[in-house]
Swiss-Prot record:
HAMAP family: F420_G6P_DH. Homodimer. It comes from the Bacteria. It comes from Nocardia farcinica (strain IFM 10152). This is F420-dependent glucose-6-phosphate dehydrogenase. Substrate binds at residues 195, 198, 259, 283. The keyword Oxidoreductase applies. The gene is fgd. GO terms for molecular function: coenzyme F420 binding; glucose-6-phosphate dehydrogenase (coenzyme F420) activity; oxidoreductase activity, acting on paired donors, with incorporation or reduction of molecular oxygen. Gene3D superfamilies: Luciferase-like domain. SUPFAM superfamilies: Bacterial luciferase-like. Pfam families: Bac_luciferase. GO terms for biological process: carbohydrate metabolic process. PANTHER family: 5,10-METHYLENETETRAHYDROMETHANOPTERIN REDUCTASE (PTHR43244:SF1), PTHR43244. InterPro entries: F420-dep_G6P_DH, F420-G6PD/mer, F420_G6P_DH-rel, Luciferase-like_dom, Luciferase-like_sf.
Amino acid sequence: MGDLELGFKASAEQFGPRELVDIAVLAEEHGMDSATVSDHFQPWRHKGGHAPFSLAWMAAVGARTERIKLGTSVLTPTFRYNPAVIAQAFATMGCLYPGRVMLGVGTGEALNEIATGYQGEWPEFKERFARLREAVELMRALWTGDRVDFDGQYYRTVGASIYDVPEGGVPIYIAAGGPLVARYAGRAGDGFICTSGKGMELYTDKLMPAVAEGAAKAGRSVDSIDRMIEIKISYDTDPELALENTRFWAPLSLTAEQKHSITDPIEMEAAADALPIEQIAKRWIVASDPDQAVEQIKPYLDAGLNHLVFHAPGHDQRRFLDLFQRDLAPRLRALA
């Protein structure tokens, strides 16, 4: 297993831009190794929701921090964005903050793309995955600094060059919820991203073996891939608060089909708020005892995931960071 890293998920759907930057600065002060941000044009819920622009956030946090790694988890470089422009943006940030910037990518959700003008039926997974692979190929070509004539099925460049590129380009982390994309992440990604709370068999029997298989086919060691998981955790010494804090994130407990097909935050919110708190909390590690919390986190480490990014659902993120630094971080680092 690679070196253990502990990261913080900056929830752009829950906090405005200034507060979200301040929270990330706090995360570095509390010893976190990374901070990743979601990239939403629209939030999961209408009331109380936010959606600051992820790239502006990354640039602002980079200017106010010195050490913490920064990235998206995740951005879709294939619909409302042109991948060539995303390549330029991340190259610039990579020059500004050398060795600290990563690009986490995924296949996309209708919630963010339909509102910005995508026309027609939301594409099936096969097309979304094909677009992602093509976008990754194009971005990597542009990060060489060479002139790129690219004539793909979805994207095209003519004599395109990015003039300011960090040495080695920008690490790409590929998000996967199933073995097909996980295999691709093992073959082509610098990192792999998944999310917790979906049954350990998914990670032990499907995702991690697929990452290893993809790496082997590419002649790579799986240890060369940063294996990141967003751990949904509601930890608080007050057990009632730990449970209640999950309510804001009820949309995560909708079915995958609902999350990928609903295009309106108002509709998403209505569907999510109809769920009972017990169902909402199932996606989360809800704990008030630190040893019990770590006991539920440890299986992900045992499965081979080395970069744990913690997503806390409560509105008081400073409280979570204080408790995490005091109660959980020492126990987790002792495991490694």
